């Protein structure tokens, strides 16, 4: 039996994730006119482009909400963001520049905390502004049903009647004005923006064309570092971790992770750190393109990864990276709280993050241009004297030890040579100019 309603649930409570923008304002008032009883829930995610959260619930009541609540999600969102950082849950990157899954993290928190608030008010029908082509419709569906198995979904944007009556921004604006609201439609940007305390996503409209680059975006968490008239000064910053948790920036200790993230955003934002242009696969396997900002997470990630590589061995780092990519994809798909994701996340937090204690000094320049100046940790397994080119006392191994080690390599070198000979005999290497290998002959040919 489907949980999705395709027409207005008359005389029933409907919870709507209310942002205060045109779409949700028009939808809320329209549902009220059609006989539904709207309950508005607004998530305070620390959106950098939101100036007055307290005004949003009052606006919802004016549009017809029976009840309007503001839910502070910032602490939980930052906690989930740090968990993603600790486990490297980022699978989308281009040429080493990472997208930090900030929108999927925001949806995980919004989808669970708002539905939990709805349950307190005995609201079992939920609506939001996600469209049928995007990722969010599935993310919210999964998280909502995880929190409330009795939940039903009503999305105005899946209702043909709503689409016919209010099919676009112009129609929605006219509808509100006709209903007596002094609504002035904002100047439409060349792209859409969604943000939270962890990062911002810019996509759609002009950005759907790959010929439109990052330069058409006005950053909301940083500076347009590509512009010559924007002054960006070099800056040294120190980041300290204790047992995998960021605790200090530039020597200032933060007991509140929300305040630490805000300061990290300010520092990274001064340089445009963490901006990226990505082509990605949506959940439905169609490709989309986005311009992303995440100045604070990018700063913390540089320091965290530096400590990871200085503390852990190669196999642990490999496992951390492989599991992190898998976990990042699960997060992107709306499966952050699924058992397979919890297993990957908690393994990384326990066995990788808990060893990460130390301080990293970084010089930030423009955009993602930076240098690591110093790394200090009592847990470092990096020891320069082990491989020093100078003569050292108590060397960990001698030339004779290396001769023995190289001699043991003869076993796999011989095996490799035999396999290459087999490939040559069956014609796999003959004439293959893409494989830069010397000609392999049989040992018997040299006798």
Curated annotation (Swiss-Prot):
What is any Pfam family matched here? Arginosuc_syn_C
Q: Which residues bind ATP?
A: 17-25, 43, 129, 131, 136, 194
EC code(s) of this entry: 6.3.4.5
Task: Using the UniProt record, name the top-level EC class of this enzyme in a single word.
Answer: ligase
Where it sits in the cell: the answer is: Cytoplasm
A single BP term in Gene Ontology: L-arginine biosynthetic process
Identify the residues that bind L-citrulline.
99, 135, 139, 192, 201, 203, 280
* GO molecular function list: argininosuccinate synthase activity; ATP binding; protein homodimerization activity
Its main subcellular localisation, reduced to a broad class, is: cytoplasm
Source species, domain of life = Bacteria
The protein's matches in InterPro entries, at most eight in alphabetical order, are given as: Arg_succ_synth_type2_subfam, Arginosuc_syn_C, Arginosuc_syn_N, Arginosuc_synth, Arginosuc_synth_CS, Arginosuc_synth_type_1_subfam, AS_cat/multimer_dom_body, AS_multimer_C_tail
Which pathway is this protein assigned to? Amino-acid biosynthesis; L-arginine biosynthesis; L-arginine from L-ornithine and carbamoyl phosphate: step 2/3
One annotated Gene Ontology cellular component of this protein:
cytoplasm
Where along this sequence does the record place binding of L-aspartate?
131, 135-136
Q: Which UniProt keywords apply?
A: Amino-acid biosynthesis, Arginine biosynthesis, ATP-binding, Cytoplasm, Ligase, Nucleotide-binding
Q: What's its catalytic activity?
A: L-citrulline + L-aspartate + ATP = 2-(N(omega)-L-arginino)succinate + AMP + diphosphate + H(+)
Assembly and interaction partners: Homotetramer.
| Family assignment from sequence similarity | Belongs to the argininosuccinate synthase family. Type 2 subfamily.
Name the UniProt record assigns to this protein:
Argininosuccinate synthase
């Amino acid at each position: 039996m489907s949980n999705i309603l395709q027409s207005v649930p008359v005389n029933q409570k409907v919870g709507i994730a209310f942002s205060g923008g045109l779409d949700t304002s028009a939808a809320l008032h329209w549902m009220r006119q059609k006989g539904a009883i709207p309950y508005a829930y607004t998530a305070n995610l620390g959106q950098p482009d939101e100036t007055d959260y307290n005004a949003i619930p009052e606006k919802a009541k004016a549009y017809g909400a029976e009840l309007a609540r503001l839910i502070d999600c910032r602490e939980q969102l930052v906690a989930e963001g740090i968990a993603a950082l600790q486990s490297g849950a980022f699978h989308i990157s281009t040429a080493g520049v990472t997208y930090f899954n900030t929108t999927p993290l925001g949806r995980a928190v919004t989808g669970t905390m708002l539905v939990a608030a709805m349950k307190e008010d005995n609201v079992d029908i939920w609506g939001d502004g996600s469209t049928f082509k995007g990722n969010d419709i599935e993310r919210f569906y999964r998280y909502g049903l995880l929190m409330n198995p009795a939940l039903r979904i009503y999305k105005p944007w899946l209702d043909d009647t709503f689409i016919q009556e209010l099919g676009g921004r112009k129609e929605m604006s006219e509808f509100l004005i006709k209903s007596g609201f002094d609504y002035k439609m904002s100047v439409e940007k060349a792209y859409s923006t969604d943000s939270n305390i962890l990062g911002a996503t810019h996509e759609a409209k002009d950005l759907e064309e790959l010929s439109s680059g990052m330069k058409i975006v006005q950053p909301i968490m940083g500076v347009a570092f590509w512009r010559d008239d924007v002054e960006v000064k070099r800056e040294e910053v120190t980041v300290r971790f204790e047992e995998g948790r960021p605790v200090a920036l530039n020597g200032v200790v933060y007991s509140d992770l929300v305040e630490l993230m805000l300061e990290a955003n300010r520092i990274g934002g001064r340089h445009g750190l963490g901006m990226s242009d990505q082509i990605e696969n949506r959940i439905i396997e169609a490709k989309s393109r986005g311009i992303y900002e995440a100045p604070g997470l990018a700063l913390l990630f540089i320091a965290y990864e530096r400590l990871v590589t200085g503390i852990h061995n190669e196999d642990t780092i490999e496992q951390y990276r492989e599991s992190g990519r898998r976990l990042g994809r699960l997060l992107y798909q709306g499966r952050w709280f699924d058992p397979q994701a919890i297993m990957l996340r908690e393994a990384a937090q326990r066995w990788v993050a808990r060893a990460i204690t130390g301080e990293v000094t970084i010089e930030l320049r423009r955009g993602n241009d930076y240098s690591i100046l110093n790394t200090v940790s009592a847990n470092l397994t990096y020891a320069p004297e082990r491989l020093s080119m100078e003569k050292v006392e108590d060397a960990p191994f001698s030339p004779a030890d290396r001769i023995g080690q190289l001699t043991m390599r003869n076993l796999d070198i011989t095996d490799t040579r035999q396999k290459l000979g087999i490939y040559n005999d069956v014609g796999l290497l003959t004439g293959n100019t893409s494989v830069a290998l010397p000609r392999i002959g049989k040992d018997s040919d040299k006798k």
